Design a protein with these regions (language model features):
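Conserved Rossmann-fold NAD(P)-dependent oxidoreductase catalytic core, especially the SDR/UDP-sugar
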Residues: 93-140
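Flexible, glycine-rich beta-alpha linker
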Residues: 114-116, 145, 163-189
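NAD(P)H-binding glycine-rich loop region in Rossmannoid oxidoreductase-like domains
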Residues: 38, 48-86
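N-terminal Rossmann NAD(P)H-binding glycine-rich loop of SDR-like oxidoreductase domains
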Residues: 4-25
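Alpha-helical substrate-binding/gating segment
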Residues: 162, 173-180, 192-213, 220
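Glycine-rich NAD(P)-binding loop of the Rossmann-fold in SDR/ketoreductase-type enzymes
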Residues: 49, 66, 82-93, 101, ...
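Catalytic helix-loop patch of NAD(P)-dependent Rossmann-fold dehydrogenases
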Residues: 85, 121-168
């Protein structure tokens, strides 16, 4: 049985369920979600906007090492009040609880929407051949309140590392699709992050020697416009899938 304990917040969401299925062999898994399903000893119902609920959950998991923080409002068009409470306040609450409980590392689900305005409004960069790659060194250009909330989450992660030594990896996640099919939308040909590349990226983010980093989460798509060279060199991310090579569903 794995000896390192991992808590996944937002464990019932799309990314949470993918990670839960594929990381169970590597970590002793625990989950946190605002929604309730069948009772399980290793999944806790909690609201991340309520610090006492987070602290109570972490207090019930002795020797917890890692957190993958996915919980929050995932809507790209979410209003300010929601992202302020759930994504900004909720992320701050997770990091503060992690600090208080001696967690080693948090992997924070940031988003490509931290720099979404580079794609154009509405997005059109995916229609261009050989565009300049967007890197983590480019200035932030969020394309809405959701993007702002993820920029703020990255800043929270940085502060908790600099002030308290709480290790963090921030992943600017691309398009993770329920059916794992990048051909349902032209933009996905550029932005798709396959399920197996997602799992690899998160696992390597948890175990890498790097103490803090920000990386784009995207497969090795021929038409991608996000730079992953730092993820390759720093955490040994080796994406296996390319939207241009994936099988199209039979009509």
């Amino acid at each position: 049985m794995p000896d390192q304990k991992l808590l996944i917040t937002g464990c019932y969401g799309l990314i949470g369920t993918i990670l839960w299925e594929h990381l169970a062999d590597s970590f002793e898994l625990y989950g946190l979600d605002i929604h309730s399903r069948e009772p399980k000893d290793n999944i806790f119902q909690a609201d991340i906007t309520k610090p006492e609920q987070i602290n109570n959950t972490l207090g019930r998991i002795p020797s917890l090492t890692y957190i993958v923080h996915l919980a929050g409002d995932p809507r790209m068009d979410a209003d300010w009040d929601s992202v302020y409470s759930n994504n900004i306040g909720g992320t701050k609450n997770i990091y503060e609880a992690a600090r208080l409980h001696g967690i080693k590392r948090v992997v924070f689900a940031s988003s490509n929407h931290t720099t979404g305005a580079y794609e154009g409004l509405p997005p059109s960069l995916h229609t261009k051949d050989n565009p300049n790659l967007i890197t983590i060194n480019d200035p932030i250009r969020p394309d809405g309140f959701y993007g702002i909330s993820k920029v703020t989450g990255e800043a929270i992660a940085r502060m908790y590392y600099d002030l308290f030594g709480l290790e963090s990896i921030c992943l600017r996640i691309g398009s993770v699709l329920r059916d794992d099919n990048p051909h349902s939308n032209p933009r996905y040909e550029s932005t798709w992050l396959s399920h197996r590349d997602l799992v690899q990226l998160v696992k390597k983010s948890l175990l890498a020697d790097v103490k803090f980093g920000i990386y784009y989460g995207v497969s090795k798509n021929k038409r991608r416009f996000w730079d992953i060279s730092n993820a390759v060199s720093e955490i040994n991310y080796q994406p296996e899938d390319d939207a241009s090579h994936s099988l199209r569903p039979q009509s």
